[in-house]
From Swiss-Prot:
It is found in: Cell membrane. InterPro entries: COX15/CtaA_fam, HemeA_Synthase_type2. Disulfide bonds: none annotated. It catalyses: Fe(II)-heme o + 2 A + H2O = Fe(II)-heme a + 2 AH2. It is a multi-pass membrane protein. Its cofactor is heme b. Heme binds at H254, H307. The keyword Iron applies. GO terms for biological process: heme A biosynthetic process. Keywords: Cell membrane, Heme biosynthesis, Iron, Membrane, Metal-binding, Oxidoreductase, Transmembrane, Transmembrane helix. This is Heme A synthase. The chain crosses the membrane at residues 6-26, 88-108, 121-141, 154-174, 190-210, 252-272, 279-299, 301-321.
């Protein structure tokens, strides 16, 4: 029963993280992330209530680069819409913190969390605190001189989320009694790890694509406006020290590693030949198709959101496979 309670708690935390990822993606895609100009973890729990409160928040926003260069003259009703989108994202973060920390303290006092699980959840707690700070660090980059957040900070924000989700998911699987049932060679085990690493790298590149709005260029597939490799890259752009600032290069890299992951997805069931490997193959192929559809349709909200959230499903499948295999 105790294990069941812990599993339910950890499963709820995983779902909450995915919900935060979804809302965070919507926040990014609707350009709502810079609407709240302060970080008030405690006093910012409630949104503006009165007309005077809303006018005050609108006045603060009117001093930001985004307002001055992009949204000058935005109506109060439109401002409320983007403000509430960002507010919901931050509120979910607070709720997730409560859902995680309160039960963890209870289970710790009852001595139901021990050993490796306790250490792992301690890391999750630290990552959660760091993630909140990173979120504000990211937003702050778009409130000073330029009307957009640093794409590197956006990528770091996502990377921390991936780590946090992976640790929670691994802990959930463990609490559910998931154990290694498939024997694989050392090489196949390393390949499974490689697939997880390359997927995470691809997700981070996806964040860079989002941060640079690189999905809004070269909306053709498989060629990039008629070329396999764009002329900007052939001219040596990839070799410069600032290639990750170039939207063309970043989109090309995202395409390239998507192909690498896809090839790996096809190889996994051929190498391992058990049910879970086919599930992963299907999940990655679906993610690849979501990515292509998002690109060629000009990054619509519903497809881009699906593409982002499904990447976490792929990570969950890869962590699951690493949990059910063992080296022989």
């Amino acid at each position: 029963m105790r294990t069941s309670h812990i599993a339910t708690w950890l499963g709820t935390c995983c779902i909450m993280v995915l919900l935060m990822v979804f809302v965070g993606g919507v926040t990014r895609l609707t350009n709502s992330g810079l609407s709240i100009t302060e970080w008030r973890p405690v006093t910012g729990v409630l949104p503006p209530i009165s007309d005077a409160d809303w006018a005050k928040e609108h006045e603060k926003y009117a001093k930001t680069p985004e307002y001055l260069y992009i949204n000058s003259g935005i109506s109060l009703s439109d401002f409320k819409r983007i403000y509430m989108t960002e507010y919901v994202h931050r509120l979910l973060g607070r709720i997730l913190g409560i859902i995680f920390f309160v039960p963890m303290l209870y289970f710790a006092v009852k001595r139901q969390i021990k050993g490796a699980l306790a250490a792992r959840l301690g890391i999750v707690a630290l990552l959660g605190a760091l993630q909140g700070a990173m979120g504000w660090f990211m937003v702050k980059s778009g409130l000073v001189d330029v009307p957009y957040v640093s794409h590197f900070r956006l990528a770091a924000h996502l990377f921390l989320t991936i780590l946090l989700f992976s640790l929670l998911w691994h802990s959930f699987l463990e609490s559910r009694g998931v154990v290694a049932v498939h024997k694989v060679t050392h090489g196949k085990y390393i390949f499974a790890i490689f697939m997880l690493v390359i997927t995470v790298l691809q997700m981070v590149l996806g964040a860079l694509v989002a941060g640079l709005d690189a999905g809004l260029i070269f909306n053709t597939f498989p060629l990039m406006d008629g070329d396999i490799i764009p002329s900007q890259i052939l001219s040596g752009e990839l070799l410069t020290g600032k290639f990750l600032y170039n939207a063309v290069v970043v989109q090309f890299l995202h395409r390239f590693f998507a192909t690498v992951v896809l090839v790996g997805a096809v190889a996994i069931p051929l190498l391992m030949r058990f049910k879970e490997s086919w599930m992963l193959c299907f999940g990655i192929v679906l993610q690849f198709l979501f990515g292509v559809a998002t690109l060629v349709h000009g990054v619509p909200l519903y497809l881009a959101s699906l593409h982002q959230i499904w990447s976490f499903v792929v990570v969950a499948l890869e962590v699951y496979i690493l949990k059910v295999i063992r080296k022989v």
